[in-house]
Amino acid sequence: MSTNMDLAEMKDPAPVREKEHEHFRTDHLLANIGHRAVSGGFVTVGAQAAKFTLNFLAAAVLARLLDPRDFGLVGMVLGVTAMVQVFSQLGLSIATIQRETITQAQVTNLFWINVGFSGTLAILSAALAPLTAKFYHDPRVTAVMLALSVTFVITGATVQHQALLTRQMRFPALAVIDVTSAAIGFGLACVMAWRGFAYWALVAQQVATATCSLIFMWLTSGWRPNLPSRNSGVKPLVSFGAHLSLADFVGQFSANSDSILLGRFFGASPLGLYTRAQVLLARPIQQIITPINNVLIPVLSRLQHDADRYRRSYMRAYGTLALIVFSFAAMCLALSKPLVLVILGPKWAGAIPLFAMFTIVAISQPLSAICSWIYESQGRGKDQLTNHTAAGLVTIASFVLGLHWGPIGVVTSLAVVSLIIRLPIVYYIAGRSGPVKTSDLWMGFLSHLPCWVGVFLMTALAVRLLGHHSNLVQLLICGPAGLIAGSALFLLFPRPRESAFFAAGKVSGALKTRFAK
């Protein structure tokens, strides 16, 4: 009798079972999910502001310590590894976040699948390094690709810990990890660039950031995997993740085809100008999307059976993002010259027209990318794959169409095609089922266009009036002046005004809640 009881306790010890349950249960989040979403968003926005400052400093410092060809060389390799990196996650982080109930055995098996597949990808990447160097006609690519292949394994071992923290809406912890890891990577890159390590500073930044994220995720999460087990019911999760992974691969392949084509046919220096112009605009926008993304997917996943609340939550987030992205893109277009020269320096003047065209791309791409919130929160992996495939083919076609004219031809073609072909396709697929319809997405997009028009006109007018002043003065005065004056114009329209008041109310409420504690 005693032996049987001991065996039962060993198989299912209550303390262990209770401890494991803490990592997976989400029922306690539903009672105040709105407050958690706003509070989490507030914390994450603060972290992104800190990360934005870091990235601004990194862009300014590294652009002066390194040459365009250094960024171009690493950009060549990242164009390839970014596509392979998708499979290190296999879409299994979203599978863990989106699932209503999940077990220790399931997450354990997902962890080992991530690690095993990541190791395989690292070996494959290392094997392909010499061929990639031949493709680019640059022998330096081999060593860079070998070094960056290490990040596959690091990322694979981080996926499930990050997913569990997101599932539990532990946004402050995620924010601290994100900023701290980025700061360490940036610091190392600056030291190495200053010491003359050239492009290796950028490689070290990638590896250091990923390694720090791994260490901090493991320490913060507290979750530890067991050995793999059979019959855990993990097959549906892997199936869902496979669709997401394929969709992400198609998306990454199309998104990085420009870097691959430009690196192959035009070399490292033109690609360096292109990637810096792209990153200078895309990174701040990504840091705007990231806090909303981190908060909204878990929230929408919990609301997937409440159509009215789901649609309302999504469209409010859409309106807030449209307001910010349109205003930011318009301001950047009017300030293209002073922005590039102040942040990157005079030797990057060739990036000014590229940066200006990327602001046109920014009108449509972020607001098509966030359709992934719909697919991931509703478990529509097949639809996401269809979406990414159709949009990816259109994007690659735009790159090929503009390649003859070099970097400026590629980005101009992308801007036009994204707006008139890609966006309609994406909105049709996203809205053909579920609470959010295609008409909702178009209404959200078109009703917020006055934000872009108002801010651009007012900022451009300010630049024209102060054009005789230095670039720094134009940046410091014309940007805020154009944003304030433009806001006064677009607030005359009901939808932008509603989005602005909603966002302001949420921020005000979060501030009051935090300072009341």
Question: What is the meaning of each model-derived region?
Answer:
Residues 57-85, 142-143, 235-240, 244, ...:
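Interfacial/gating helices of multi-pass transporter permease domains
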Residues 87-104, 166-167, 277, 281-325, ...:
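Helix-loop junctions and terminal segments of transmembrane helices
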Residues 1-56, 94-97, 101-112, 139-142, ...:
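N-terminal membrane topogenesis motif
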Residues 2-25, 56, 112-137, 142-146, ...:
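Alpha-helical transmembrane segments of multi-pass membrane transport and lipid-handling proteins
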Residues 40-55, 202-205, 209, 213, ...:
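Transmembrane helical elements of multi-pass membrane transporters/channels
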Residues 28, 51-55, 59, 78-81, ...:
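Short runs within selected transmembrane alpha-helices of multi-pass transporters and secretion channels
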Residues 3, 10-22, 124, 390-394, ...:
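Transmembrane alpha-helical segments of multi-pass transport proteins
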Residues 14, 18-33, 172, 215-260, ...:
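Interhelical loop/hinge segments that connect adjacent transmembrane helices in multipass membrane
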